[in-house]
């Protein structure tokens, strides 16, 4: 039996525009499960798929996000014209339990796949009575929805493949290694509570009398993946080293909140206990040793501002040269409470000031068009962006999307002129920050040809996700070069490769 895993993550309408340097953990995890059960498997990004090769495979897995719906729908239609192989859809797109009524696949895997896929293999992919799946019953011509599966407690079952060369850009990509699964924020968005008040889940609770899904209202992680739990250090290090041996240059230690790592058992309290400093330092120090050994970089991603303090910053500054990503979402304190946020804008301001003190580059996330957003909250968010801009390296803004299994799944984006003001302010601040790079010489991993000008190339900084358009750089794909920055834009930089003789000075 042979399986093809098609990576559609962040492909939107069919072509990945943003985050082209990201290789998520999901498809590798699926490949590892299949290989552990004796099934030959290959990953292909959707852009690299040769549809004629589909006939070679008995099983077609598709990994996608909710925003990739159009891409997946068109892809499945193309596959159906070529083969009758079983099509299984997974990833966040499958959190919509009715997805098979919209996409002509056979099975969807809702949530974690480690046990579900193994059960499907044992049953020759007959999904009847397999928890965590929906499937199309062709005899009755209807969608069947099985009960959700309990969250995975044995994280030893997470066995990702490290055969990373399925991805052509593995050498320049940020390759995600799962460290923590699930989230510790089991508060509820007060926007959905009667009188906008509740004293039951101030610090998080597993059960809600109103059956409101846990976590920030816009996020589905607690509902899908449960409370935060951590992989063993030895398993993480084994995976990291195997990827570095394959030639990966940038590893991201992936977690909804890295500071939840080994913080406790069954974490549903985003405030207590405090971070496990010893475990964090042990993991980062050993990852840094591996990165130094293979001349690579190890990055972390998300952290909660309320858990970030000087002790954490001191540890990070010893082992990391990379940005840290902090969610703020709204610059209005009351709005944050309504959203179910564990942190306030004051927490974020304190965190970015600490980061600056320890020479850590902070990047802060915001969302516009959120439920509860109004003129006052939007203006407070804009003012807060200006308050933090001197302490940060970037602002990232997203448009609110209602995600299946999130508390706000039935809301629609509330886009007003004040919402757009949030986006416009972020763009202006980002341009202002990026202009500071003009004239600097930076090391850039040159990844691929530019979409329009084939003589130019797209590259990335080794220690971040910052994109650089390298003029006349196409002949250096796969190499790391010193690039002098000559222009700055809202989302990327532009530069030229230094002449070899200049690199000495």
Swiss-Prot record:
Cofactor(s) the record lists: [4Fe-4S] cluster
Domain TRAM: 435-499
Single Gene Ontology MF annotation: metal ion binding
Keywords: 4Fe-4S, Iron, Iron-sulfur, Metal-binding, S-adenosyl-L-methionine
Signal peptide: none
Alphabetized InterPro entries for the sequence: Cobalamin-bd, Elp3/MiaA/NifB-like_rSAM, rSAM, rSAM_horseshoe, Tetrapyrrole_Bchl_Biosynth_MTs, TRAM_dom
Keyword 4Fe-4S attributed: yes
Binding site for [4Fe-4S] cluster: 208, 216, 219
Coiled-coil ranges (or none): none
The keyword Lipid metabolism is assigned to this record: no
SUPFAM superfamilies: Radical SAM enzymes (SSF102114)
Entries under Pfam families matching the protein: B12-binding, Radical_SAM, TRAM
Domain (Radical SAM core) ranges: 193-440
Protein name from the UniProt record: Uncharacterized protein MJ1620
Organism name: Methanocaldococcus jannaschii (strain ATCC 43067 / DSM 2661 / JAL-1 / JCM 10045 / NBRC 100440)
